[in-house]
């Protein structure tokens, strides 16, 4: 076979271009990070090199089933092609720079992305192991009860930085083909950031999670959580089918406007209408959505709020997760008492809603829901504005 010349144009074509991600960890000069490509993109790349499309299947299997990042170890691929790959490509996941282990088995990793840190959380249980993955460096939505939101926002994560969190966790825990057991059975896009504000990178990353030559997860085991970016939610339904969870957290617009400013743009009825449209397109959700509801003491946790929530959700097939609020420094809220949570739950069940009180995991290492912070260079200048206004600033506990 004649030698294939790979031009700078080829490299550029298959290197995801994103202004938001331009400050990411620098790749080797001119090399394509294969973690940025889904299977079709990898096939297109390899065909441009004069190779057969099935080569992408082979390489992906090594990458994701064995967590292999060394082309020389891919022994069922001929040496000539391996040499080509070494010249133009690499497999480079973001590095873990800190690890904390909770007394309950939860692990939190700080992942370095372009000089900043995002956080990824591994939650093992008897029957499954869930990985909570970040989609952005910080978050722009300013939800008042969430630590991530208080850090401000810097940029979207690239595909390689999203799927790289899964790859890095799987490599640490033990790759499927190495141990014989799946290190990760579920992935939830519930880490730092709003996934629907980064569809360009989140969707290809989820495609790799679902791909049989990727991590091979069922679409019911990959969950995207959103605070309600309605146009993007409508778009998501045409792009991919995964389980959906919605961060509702309030039964009325008045309360939600106060704790989740996005509601001023997309109110509850607009949000739930978009959810119902998504459910009509989706098989992964089995006809119902998961509603997430953080319990804030004397803010949204009274029995009157439970009745309002039941009325609000009467036309939306769902199950409800009640989430004990997890504190962080500078936050103005308190956690609801067990008795208030119990009364709230009983009201919802009387209406016929499947209602679960989520067990808090990893709170002793600030890895629980709403506690992820990382290290963010805030492009929104949110923390500076708070400081100038004399408002409390949430800081990551050390």
Swiss-Prot record:
InterPro entries: Aldolase_TIM (IPR013785), Methyltransferase_A (IPR040072), RlmN_N (IPR048641), RNA_MTrfase_RlmN (IPR027492), rRNA_lsu_MTrfase_RlmN/Cfr (IPR004383), rSAM (IPR007197). The active site is at residues 119, 369. Reaction proceeds by a ping-pong mechanism involving intermediate methylation of a conserved cysteine residue. HAMAP family: RNA_methyltr_RlmN. Residues 125-364 form the Radical SAM core domain. Specifically methylates position 2 of adenine 2503 in 23S rRNA and position 2 of adenine 37 in tRNAs. m2A2503 modification seems to play a crucial role in the proofreading step occurring at the peptidyl transferase center and thus would serve to optimize ribosomal fidelity. Disulfide bonds join 132-369. S-adenosyl-L-methionine binds at residues 193-194, 225, 247-249, 326. Keywords: 4Fe-4S, Cytoplasm, Disulfide bond, Iron, Iron-sulfur, Metal-binding, Methyltransferase, rRNA processing, S-adenosyl-L-methionine, Transferase, tRNA processing. The gene is rlmN. This is Dual-specificity RNA methyltransferase RlmN. One of its GO terms (molecular function) is rRNA binding. GO terms for cellular component: cytoplasm. PROSITE patterns: RADICAL_SAM. It is an enzyme of class 2 (transferase). GO terms for biological process: rRNA base methylation; tRNA methylation.
